[in-house]
Design a protein with these regions (language model features):
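A generic local structural motif
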Residues: 1-3, 132-137, 197-199
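Glycine-rich phosphate/adenosyl-contacting loop at the front of the ribokinase-like
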Residues: 2-89, 112, 131
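A short, aliphatic-rich alpha-helical micro-motif
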Residues: 8, 138-143, 202-205
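Short glycine-rich anion-binding loops that position phosphate/pyrophosphate groups of nucleotides
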Residues: 19-20, 110, 122-125, 153-155, ...
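A glycine- and small-aliphatic-rich helix-loop capping segment at beta-alpha/alpha-beta transitions
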Residues: 29-33, 135-137, 166-167
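Conserved beta-alpha-beta core of the PfkB/ribokinase-like small-molecule kinase fold
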Residues: 147-229
Length: 229
């Protein structure tokens, strides 16, 4: 099946995301035994967007930054180095207990020791993403986007990001952009919000041209029954 794309679009792909950094011990060591780490800028959605960006296609990232944060500056420089345009609010840290960029503590594993990842997301600035920070009419109308890639991670991160992703899907659809939606179910993100997120994910899925997920994703996000045992 062939999918046609809007031809007058400035951007080949757009992704909404919450940016953070990953700390990985050197030489395959366990995290708790290490004192030297490699720090990398990361997000699931920009991992996807890196592919068209490095193939020379124009990509845009919608995210949020902590104002005057050196981590935010590192993230911006990294996105620029991956040939991506970025746009988003500069949010005040609000003191030592305020907003920050998430940390991903990644033990890569070695031999029979499997990899382990711990997400340290308290105060994550990306949870504040909201349509009020963006001119969606300009982005999808005047500028134009061929395809939007949405992830269930950012879609379930907070009530604000859930609505943000739904607003993006609606705006994209109304302006002729294609939509790719990776359901990416995470039980810890859905806890206590099951019905709310089911309704939002179902509407985003109904607007999407491409759905990505395994059997469990479709069952738990969209309520689609699996085969009988």
């Amino acid at each position: 099946m062939a999918i046609s794309f809007r031809e007058d679009a400035k951007y080949a792909m757009l992704v909404p995301t919450s940016m953070g950094v990953r700390l990985t011990p050197l030489d395959g060591q366990p995290f708790h035994c290490s004192d030297t780490f490699k720090m990398q800028v990361t997000s699931a959605e920009t991992n996807v967007a890196s592919i068209p960006a490095f193939l020379g296609m124009p990509v845009k990232v919608l995210t949020a930054f902590v104002k005057d944060s050196p981590v935010a500056r590192m993230i911006k420089d990294n996105l620029a180095g991956r040939h991506m345009d970025y746009e988003g609010p500069e949010i005040e840290q609000g003191g030592p207990w305020g907003s920050r960029h998430q940390f991903n503590l990644a033990d890569s594993g070695y031999g029979s020791r499997g990899p382990r990842v711990q997400n340290d997301r308290a105060g994550e600035v990306g949870r504040l993403l909201d349509t009020k920070y963006f001119d969606l009419e300009r982005i999808f109308g005047a500028e134009g986007v061929k395809i939007v890639h949405l992830s269930g991670l950012i879609g379930a991160l907070s009530p604000e990001t859930s609505k943000f992703c739904l607003d993006i899907a609606r705006a994209a659809k109304s302006h002729g952009s294609r939509i790719s939606f990776d359901l990416n179910y995470r039980a810890s993100f859905w806890k206590g919000r099951e019905q709310e997120l089911h309704d939002i994910f179902s509407e985003i899925a109904s607007l999407s041209d491409v759905l990505i997920g395994n059997e469990e994703d479709f069952q738990l996000c969209l309520g689609i029954q699996g085969p009988e045992a």
